Amino acid sequence: MAMMAASHDDDTVDGLATAVRGGDRAALPRAITLVESTRPDHREQAQQLLLRLLPDSGNAHRVGITGVPGVGKSTAIEALGMHLIERGHRVAVLAVDPSSTRTGGSILGDKTRMARLAVHPNAYIRPSPTSGTLGGVTRATRETVVLLEAAGFDVILIETVGVGQSEVAVANMVDTFVLLTLARTGDQLQGIKKGVLELADIVVVNKADGEHHKEARLAARELSAAIRLIYPREALWRPPVLTMSAVEGRGLAELWDTVERHRQVLTGAGEFDARRRDQQVDWTWQLVRDAVLDRVWSNPTVRKVRSELERRVRAGELTPALAAQQILEIANLTDR
């Protein structure tokens, strides 16, 4: 019976892989739901599916997009997506939101805030999986990229949502990372999270609309000066600062031309493929870390002592390092 079940699973996975490759719009969400699942039997099927589709992936340009609060990220992503479709691309939009379980996610929001893109036959929008942990969301997003590329989408836009380490996670899974910011009076770096500027490959001052155009150009000059202090003169790529009005549709072509130029520069130096290989290795170790953490959380003895250990750490009776050591010993993850 077990062999028959395995054979049936193989048939199901083969059929799903064929359907995804063929661009079946109904098969794609089924495949994505499978890779998002944390059930052990689903994880096994998902890995078999990914193994079959991996040779068909890798041809898309993966672009991460983050932004300061109020920058109009959704409007910008939709405008860029529609612009790319007009240029003959097939565009997928993913969100990385580690808070999606706690907040209820943006399952309705993604499609209502990008209404035109959501209904276009050459676009696909997928809200963040409701994993509740950044590691879980990151894993599901990386695996979803493989499915989307195998399905023929040649541009994958990955949006960061919420706060925390989502920018770093997205930067580690894309080819080009774009930071959207606003023209601000005074210090132009105000509102940009510490460290995010160093992650960016391209910086865009959005909402350069009408009377704000001059202010946006001034902000772009100030940001360019700041970036020159971060990157040495001999750097392979120094992030350019562009101005854009997503509402008016200005600057979209320049943004995408810059994304393509970034890829050309990296490819010419042999860095594009090297970056992707490094990301695969990074992904491997992230999966190891996630698996070890899952093993610790699921250990029944750890669950029994967790509250008491946390209480003692809060009370100052136990250092975090000693508490961690006890947890690892209980979970049989030390060399003692």
From Swiss-Prot:
EC number: 3.6.-.-
Top-rank lineage group of the source organism: Bacteria
GO cellular component, one term: cytoplasm
Protein's recorded name: Probable GTPase Rv1496
Top-level class of the enzyme under EC nomenclature: hydrolase
Pfam families for this protein: MeaB
GO molecular function: ATP binding; GTP binding; GTPase activity
Known partners and oligomeric status: Homodimer.
SUPFAM superfamilies with a match to the protein in the record: P-loop containing nucleoside triphosphate hydrolases
Organism lineage string: Bacteria, Bacillati, Actinomycetota, Actinomycetes, Mycobacteriales
